[in-house]
Amino acid sequence: MAGFQSSEVDPNTKNKNAEEMFNELNKVPFFMQSLEDVGDESENNVQLDALKALAYEGEPHEVAQNFREHGNECFASKRYKDAEEFYTKALAQKCGDKDIEIACYSNRAACNLLFENYRQVLNDCAQVLQRDSTHAKAYYRSAKALVALKRYDEAKECIRLCSLVHPNDPAILALSKELQKKSDDFEKRESEKKRVAQEKVIAAKTVLLALQERHIKTKTTEHPPDLGDAMISLSTFDDPKSELFFPTILLYPLVYQSDFVPSVSENCTPLELLKTVFQSPAPWDVHQLYNPDSLDVFATTDTLGLIKVGKNVPILKALTHPKVTLIDGLVQLHVVPHHLASDWISSWKKNKQENAKN
């Protein structure tokens, strides 16, 4: 074709996608979208230095407007980080042009809304509203950020002010609906939290009253065991006369084993508890000595002595024994095969005497 010279197309170009082509063009000064992120190869590029100088040439409002326009171009092409940087550079000029500053603060808020930098969104929108108290987008973006931060009352006020300017705007109506739902859900959760917290306080006081009414002595040590969620409880949390339940540990001292039962009724007997625990033989009971009917149960006294607990009487009876104290809210019962109980008791007494000497 007249006036044009043919040239060979770089074969590597065919294998490049759009993003790679854009990155290549961005290294050419004329096409650059950012004058900062240019790589080492451009350090001595005279054309680039000239372009950098041009970017800041002119009156402050002209420089700011130039950066603003670059920001708008980047935003339109969804390069939000670059857009945010250009708006920041525009604002750094402090040009004093109200319209430019409003646009840059507002658009930077839009970028930060996408980045979920909600506090920066609020800061930028506040700058907009200082310059224009009727700026609908500033109220809208503030509301979006406040919803994300769960500051629902403030968000409602922003939407109200925004609606005064654009009462039928679909985005505002949708945000208002979203806010109402989230606000209602939040209030329900907070109400439930308060209810649960109040019940816990009432339950704790009622448990203390229930223990007192049953004449059960209690003691809390400096380092109580971690029982997880298990605790003394009542079948009706605010009724001290309702059924009382205790975390209970069964200790098998002859085999150094134990079973923890999170909740045992005060009316449960040791035999009933043992039958529940030993429904299936324990893997450590290789000699099958732990048959509920052939086991003896003991509780410790305040002086570290032992009392035998009847297997067919409620556990409450052991807890109300004048020499027994409920320690750290945990019922502790020692379980020993009947034919070995005598020797174990002798060993217990011997250890107690030796500890007393020391």
From Swiss-Prot:
Keyword hit for Repeat: yes
Start-end of each TPR repeat: 64-97, 102-135, 136-169, 221-255
Location (main, coarse): cytoplasm
SUPFAM superfamilies recorded: TPR-like
Keywords recorded for this protein, A-Z: Chaperone, Cytoplasm, Nucleus, Repeat, TPR repeat
MF terms in GO: Hsp70 protein binding; Hsp90 protein binding
Gene Ontology cellular component annotations, sorted alphabetically: cytosol; nucleus
Entry-linked Pfam families: TPR_19 (PF14559), Wheel (PF18972)
Function according to Swiss-Prot or TrEMBL: Co-chaperone that binds to the molecular chaperones Hsp90 and Hsp70. Stimulates Hsp70 ATPase activity, but not Hsp90 ATPase activity. Involved in only a subset of Hsp90 functions.
The name this protein goes by in its record: Hsp70/Hsp90 co-chaperone cns1
Organism: Schizosaccharomyces pombe (strain 972 / ATCC 24843)
